[in-house]
């Protein structure tokens, strides 16, 4: 049995690009006022992760409001390939605040009590760990002062006093570490669940995006963006709960102790250190983000170039363009290298600046502590405690700097992933859409207008009727709209105007799942997965048994061919089916179609790439399957002799049906179809109207 994941359609809010940014003064407003208490510095700094990691849009901008309120409901026309790029939101328009807002729903998910309990438990454990952690300097002070003042006492009494303090110190250290590790373990499930949910949602959204998007984007860059984005999610989630909150709490507690125990001079140095450290980190990291974006862009281009050349390996070889492909790849790698050198150099500058700020503060505090001992205002234990508190402050500060830096990098990595989520799905189900009720499979196009490019209409008032159970064909010159009819019937695109009906039911009022389930297609170039023949045939019906798959292959007259392979149905077909012949690929497509068993069959130039003998054999096979099935079958063909026996032949010209009828009726008209027939029958493709039909 084959296993598949069910697909379902999801919707996404429209993303409206906007170019408006928060005033730079607002970015560091929290650090500008010198009289703000240290605790206010610390608590407000934690908001940088969500509000100031990226420039925000101006709240007065109408486009920005439309993005958040999703009030824009007007229907967009189908776009040109040039306009396609504008439909894909620029990743710079996705701000850190948007990403954090999206991520919060995964940290505190609705309807998942077990995950919420884990979040609360993790927060409780981190508070307990930090409370125990700040006890360590007190124990150090107590040990030093006790030993300094009780040396004249008996050794037993000294050990009794100091031993109790040492045990307390050990208890605080051990359980602080235990609580931290328990917190990490408890929160791991929340983090991994969020990564799975985000990745699944983005992938599902990509599957439901319009054909426009997939025709205009490089697969390599999309997969690379998803890979970087999921790694960024892991870091952001762990940072928000496991780093930002505990770091903020620890800085607040250490600053409060310094203020309470040693007065405003020590607290002023601590506050100034935190402020300067945060300001320097934010400014420098903002500057470094540009280099990270450049590295990501080069990385995506290199990945896309490599995947594209490997997919088209045969073309690379036949045109002897290995050196050209290598030069393309090397060009992107060179850009990636240069950007990463800038990232590394700017990181060295950031680390040096942070070390200078902290070391200066440590030196000042130690000087003040020594002076306090000389004046008998402080004890040696106080000096040790100050030293411990300052180093205790250094740990969260260093973490805060590195976490902020890594969060900015993670946000940059996640920009494109979340921009993919915000791409609008143009083809959507109506809120009151109903399942298609088939009554034979009649198809009607009523004055349909459609264009991929507004300057180049494809269908221009196209109208026709296909009776239920009929065998029909569409013919015409390349670009007249034959394959477009199939795409519109599948609702890969919506019409610009006009109606399409199946059994008198409008397509835009039918659920997409029931519509696409009712139609099967054998395309000109059959898309095959790099998997076994069994898997590829079974893709027509993921629930089919192996016996049903074999039966479909027998009906398509390919079972004996498959059995002749050394591995039979377990034979791998290779990338895009390149390891089997064209005729075998098309027979696999017919097998897949039979397994799906739809009511409407489409053959989109299914034999155009085959040799004459293979084409005739496959057509005989297809005709045998259609006879007696009472299914509506539609053929699109360039070779008119392959559709000569159709009940109705529609001749398309300039996006309209200009002639219709059987082969004999159309030949009797001696018009467009007749000219096409004689042109193909002539040895050199020249029209010969004097010949017999």
Swiss-Prot record:
First-listed, main subcellular location of the protein, grouped into a coarse class: mitochondrion
Mitochondrial intermembrane side: 141-163, 261, 368-382
UniProt KW Transmembrane helix keyword: yes
Coiled coil region boundaries: none
Gene Ontology MF term list: ABC-type iron-sulfur cluster transporter activity; ATP binding; ATP hydrolysis activity; ATPase-coupled transmembrane transporter activity
Keyword Transport found: yes
Keywords of this entry: ATP-binding, Membrane, Mitochondrion, Mitochondrion inner membrane, Nucleotide-binding, Transit peptide, Translocase, Transmembrane, Transmembrane helix, Transport
Subcellular location: Mitochondrion inner membrane
InterPro entries assigned to the protein according to its UniProt record, in alphabetical order: AAA+_ATPase, ABC1_TM_dom, ABC1_TM_sf, ABC_transporter-like_ATP-bd, ABC_transporter-like_CS, P-loop_NTPase, Type_1_exporter
Domain of life from the UniProt record: Eukaryota
EC number of the protein: 7.-.-.-
SMART domains, per database record: AAA
ABC transporter domain residues: 443-679
Residue positions binding ATP: 452, 476-487
Membrane-spanning residues: 119-140, 164-187, 237-260, 262-282, 349-367, 383-404
Oligomer status and interactors: Homodimer.
Protein family according to the UniProt entry: Belongs to the ABC transporter superfamily. ABCB family. Heavy Metal importer (TC 3.A.1.210) subfamily.
The name this protein goes by in its record: Iron-sulfur clusters transporter atm1, mitochondrial
Protein source organism: Schizosaccharomyces pombe (strain 972 / ATCC 24843) (Fission yeast)
């Amino acid at each position: 049995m084959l296993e598949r994941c069910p697909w379902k359609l999801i919707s996404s809010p429209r993303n409206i690009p906007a170019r408006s940014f928060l005033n730079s003064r607002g970015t560091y407003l929290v650090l500008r006022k010198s009289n703000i208490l240290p605790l206010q510095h610390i608590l407000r700094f934690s908001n940088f992760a969500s509000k100031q990691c990226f420039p925000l849009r101006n709240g007065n901008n109408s486009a920005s409001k439309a993005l958040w309120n999703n009030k824009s409901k007007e229907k967009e026309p189908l776009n040109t390939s040039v306009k396609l790029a504008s439909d894909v939101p620029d990743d710079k328009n996705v701000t850190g605040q948007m990403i954090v807002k999206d991520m919060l729903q995964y940290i505190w998910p609705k309807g998942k009590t077990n995950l919420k309990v884990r979040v609360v438990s993790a927060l409780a454990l981190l508070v307990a760990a930090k409370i125990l952690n700040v006890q360590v300097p007190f124990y150090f002070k107590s040990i030093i002062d006790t030993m300094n003042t009780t040396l004249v006492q008996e050794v037993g009494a000294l050990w009794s006093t100091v031993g109790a303090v040492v045990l307390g110190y050990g208890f605080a250290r051990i359980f602080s570490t235990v609580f931290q590790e328990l917190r990490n373990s408890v929160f791991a499930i929340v983090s991994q669940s969020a990564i799975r949910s985000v990745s699944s949602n983005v992938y599902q959204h990509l599957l439901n995006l319009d054909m426009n998007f997939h025709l205009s984007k490089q697969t390599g860059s999309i997969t690379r963006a998803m890979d970087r984005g999921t790694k960024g999610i892991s870091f952001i989630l762990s940072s928000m709960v496991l780093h930002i909150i505990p770091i903020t709490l620890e800085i607040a507690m250490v600053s409060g102790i310094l203020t309470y125990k040693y007065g405003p001079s020590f607290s002023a140095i601590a506050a100034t250190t935190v402020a300067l450290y945060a300001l320097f980190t934010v400014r420098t990291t903002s500057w470094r983000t540009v280099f990270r974006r450049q590295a990501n862009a080069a990385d995506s281009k290199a990945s896309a170039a490599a995947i594209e050349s490997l997919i088209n390996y045969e073309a690379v070889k036949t045109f002897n363009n290995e050196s050209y492909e290598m030069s393309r790849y090397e060009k992107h790698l060179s850009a990636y290298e240069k950007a990463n050198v800038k990232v590394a150099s700017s990181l060295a500058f950031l680390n040096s600046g942070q070390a200078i700020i902290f070391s200066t503060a440590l030196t000042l505090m130690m000087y003040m502590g020594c002076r306090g001992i000389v004046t008998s205002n402080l004890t040696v234990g106080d000096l040790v405690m100050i030293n411990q508190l300052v180093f205790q402050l250094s740990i969260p500060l260093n973490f805060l700097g590195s976490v902020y830096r890594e969060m900015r990098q993670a946000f940059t990595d996640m920009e494109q992933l979340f921009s993919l989520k915000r791409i609008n799905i143009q083809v959507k189900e109506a809120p009151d859409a109903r399942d298609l009720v088939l009554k034979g499979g009649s198809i009607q196009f009523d004055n349909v207008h459609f264009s991929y490019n507004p300057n180049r209409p494809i269908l221009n008032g196209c109208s026709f009727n296909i009776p239920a159970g009929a065998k029909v064909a569409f013919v015409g010159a390349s670009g007249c709209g034959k394959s477009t009819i199939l795409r519109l019937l599948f609702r890969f695109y919506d019409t610009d105007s006009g109606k399409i009906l199946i059994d008198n039911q409008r397509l835009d009022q039918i659920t997409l799942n029931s519509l696409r389930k009712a139609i099967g297609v054998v395309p000109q170039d059959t898309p095959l997965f790099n998997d076994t023949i069994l898997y590829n045939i079974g893709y027509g019906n993921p629930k089919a048994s192996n016996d049903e798959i074999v039966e479909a292959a027998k009906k398509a007259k390919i079972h004996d061919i498959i059995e002749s392979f050394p591995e039979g149905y377990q034979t791998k077909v290779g990338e895009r089916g390149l390891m089997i012949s064209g005729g075998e690929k098309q027979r696999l497509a017919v097998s897949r179609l039979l397994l799906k068993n739809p009511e409407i069959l489409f053959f989109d130039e299914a034999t155009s790439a085959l040799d004459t003998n293979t084409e005739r054999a496959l057509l005989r096979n297809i005709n045998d399957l259609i006879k007696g099935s009472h299914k509506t079958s539609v053929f699109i063909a360039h070779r008119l002799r392959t559709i000569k026996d159709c009940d109705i032949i529609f001749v398309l010209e300039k996006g309209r049906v200009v002639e219709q009828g059987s082969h004999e009726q159309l030949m009797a008209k001696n018009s467009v179809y007749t000219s096409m027939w004689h042109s193909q029958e002539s040895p050199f493709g020249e029209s010969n109207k004097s010949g017999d039909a």
